[in-house]
Amino acid sequence: MIILFVDFDYFFAQVEEVLNPQYKGKPLIVCVYSGRNEKSGAVATANYEARKLGVKAGMPISRAMELAPNAIFVPMHKEVYTEVSNRIMSIISSYSDKIEIASIDEAYIDITSKVKNFEEAIELGKKLKREIMEKEKITVTVGIAPNKVFAKIIADRVKPNGLGVVKPEEIEEFIKSIDIDEVPGVGNVISERLHSLGVNKLIDILSVSFDKLKEEIGEAKAFYLYRLATNSYFEPVLNKERVPHGRYLTLPKNTRDIKVIELYLKKAIDEAYNKIEGIPKRMTVVTIMQDLDIVSKSKTFKTGISKERAYTESIELLKQILQKDSRLVRRVGVRFDNIYKSKGLDVFFNS
């Protein structure tokens, strides 16, 4: 197998930097405020300038203010991050039909059938990074390895904006280099128990009896670590329903000319709808404005929507956006979700 893992670098904070270029290069902290006062709540994420000052995700905002009093503190804009994530996931999914979305800012794709060897995989990884940067102005880190776990570990080592590779002939030495705390799924409690057994490296697992390991951390976790240490972990990439069916296109120039925008919107619908295996019940028209702000409008259809009706309904949604927003449009796109698998005559009820 050749697995490619993608991690969006300091994602929430990076989106804020894209939308607010004046934040770039300054300590930036994205917060989840509790509402009691300006210091209550927790840090969601921070850019690398803030991390250098000791700020970490999950830290109380009050503590972050002590460590970085001159930092920029902003509230989370979850809908914006979700929209950007959906667009990036759409790009990633175009590189493989086997995609597993692990979180809002992480995904795995199986590229075994897309490349002949790891050299081609590296070139594909570079191409993916370039496309995401060109279209979304977001840097990502890519890890490539024979399994999902090693792909994530090597990516974590080369962040931010890196590309790390573990080739099959390098696996033996790579396994020896892995600290047990680097392994995904090994939290603080399990880490302490493993260290008490003398397990500091992943390879140290092999020096502990399986029964003892199972007694300390449970059979499932013991088996997981044993398989990693013996290079026998080959869990497949699992396709998840969260993969967005969307397409976004950049206009020739920023404009409010609805006829121009319509042409690109219809093209986006064609490309997105033709990839759907089933019938969508929800459609979202997305516009990215001249300042990279995102404005979207959605509509749900009880029995699903045909491509022909998607054309007409999308124009109505576009008109609603333009009526409420006076800015020029830079990009336009569409997203379909709530897909159901039924095929047949019911789609004509809404055509």
UniProtKB/Swiss-Prot annotation:
GO terms for cellular component: cytoplasm
GO biological process: DNA-templated DNA replication; error-prone translesion synthesis
Domain UmuC, residue spans: 3-187
Cofactor(s), names only, from the UniProt record: Mg(2+)
Family assignment from sequence similarity: Belongs to the DNA polymerase type-Y family.
Known function: Poorly processive, error-prone DNA polymerase involved in untargeted mutagenesis. Copies undamaged DNA at stalled replication forks, which arise in vivo from mismatched or misaligned primer ends. These misaligned primers can be extended by PolIV. Exhibits no 3'-5' exonuclease (proofreading) activity. May be involved in translesional synthesis.
Name of the protein this chain belongs to: DNA polymerase IV
Lineage, top ranks: Archaea, Thermoproteota, Thermoprotei, Sulfolobales, Sulfolobaceae
